[in-house]
UniProtKB/Swiss-Prot annotation:
Pathway: Lipid metabolism; fatty acid biosynthesis. Coiled coil: none annotated. InterPro entries: ACP_syn_III_C (IPR013747), ACP_syn_III_N (IPR013751), FabH (IPR004655), Thiolase-like (IPR016039). This is Beta-ketoacyl-[acyl-carrier-protein] synthase III. GO terms for biological process: fatty acid biosynthetic process. Its EC number is 2.3.1.180. Homodimer.
Amino acid sequence: MGAGIIGVGRYVPEKVLTNFDLEKMMDTSDEWIRTRTGIEERRIAADDIDTSDMAYFAAKRALQDAGMEAKDIDLILVATVTPDRPFPSVACMLQERLGAVNAAALDISAACAGFMYGMVTAAQFIDTGAYKYILVVGADKLSKITDWTDRNTAVLFGDGAGAVVMGPVSPGRGILSFELGADGTGGKHLYKDEYIVMNGREVFKFAVRQMGESSVRVLEKAGLTKDDVDFLIPHQANIRIVEAARQRLELPEEKISTTIRRYGNTSAASIPISLVEELEAGKIHDDDLIIMVGFGGGLTWGAIALRWGR
């Protein structure tokens, strides 16, 4: 038995903020944003919706998809850099709201790579038999830490949440290999003071290199090649970074997720939101080999090779 995904769910806020809306707020244009980022619109949570709320909505759907009740969950992991407050953790707030009375709970802070860290952590508990069912959530309300006067960052981010229930799956399914990494010397290029601060040029160079290299390495660890890949779900940070990852694996455009056009960069929620979108679109099938890869502040990165199915 391996550790895999047995249920998925996502939540995005109702409010849509388009590039044309941003034109009225700052010195920018739809053409400038689309050309440099690939983003056309993003979702923004209402003032009375916080990270824990979005996490709850996504988690409920993942549990329903898995055909499970909250009391069946042994551990809750929430990847976020925008908790409602420093403590209690979003995971503990989620545990109470779901009624997951048997679950331990903690948050993970690895920025946009957080969901990869969460999935890999969950897999270790499942593989060792310590826990059987684990809820992994990526949720961020980046709008509350975005400087809406800075056109270099304000155009990039959106809000949302994605969740998966992980548990034992059939042999040959689930996570086949993974890589996690960090380079603390790059922390100065992407961080939060009052708002998000980013050295776009340095982050871009790091992301283009690391996304492709990590994807290739997890394939090698699993004894697979680029020809074996059926679908790529990269962190949705910038369409040029996404495209670089696709080219590194030599995949056709129809085999990569590009949800950034509709949602922008949703940080830890990016990969699980994309996973649900592509499943609903019928682009991922049983026994497909999927590569998930992300990077974030820290600097951090993570990649997973996963055989889809239970």
